[in-house]
Amino acid sequence: MTKLIEPKKYTKTLDLLRSFFLSRGFLEVHTQNRLSILAACEDPETVATYEYNGEVWPLPQTGQMWLEYELLKNPEVPGFFCLSTSYRQEPNPVAGRHEVIFPMFEFEMHGGVEALEEMEKDLVAHL
């Protein structure tokens, strides 16, 4: 069973994450309504499926590919972020390490590893 997230903590955390990225010119992308086979995050063996409109689709694990798509399509934007629900059909979930359904906040930006490291340092300080 997936552990419930306390709403006040959830709201506070999302407000902090959103305000950080919006203040840097990032745009939020809704990725969950995009039917796609680009669903796997790490291990394609953990992808669950669902039937929708007569077709079988993978339940999304990540919005990463859609964030990268938006970044390539809109190079003038500094970056993009999303909040999505990740579904992982872990065969042997480890308590305290694996949740099979959980919210995930992701971002993609222009730049190399150094720019990413600076962004992450700033994000940690903001939180």
Predicted regions and their residues:
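Short, conserved charged micro-motifs
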Residues: 113-118
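Class II aminoacyl-tRNA synthetase-like tRNA-binding/catalytic domains
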Residues: 1-110
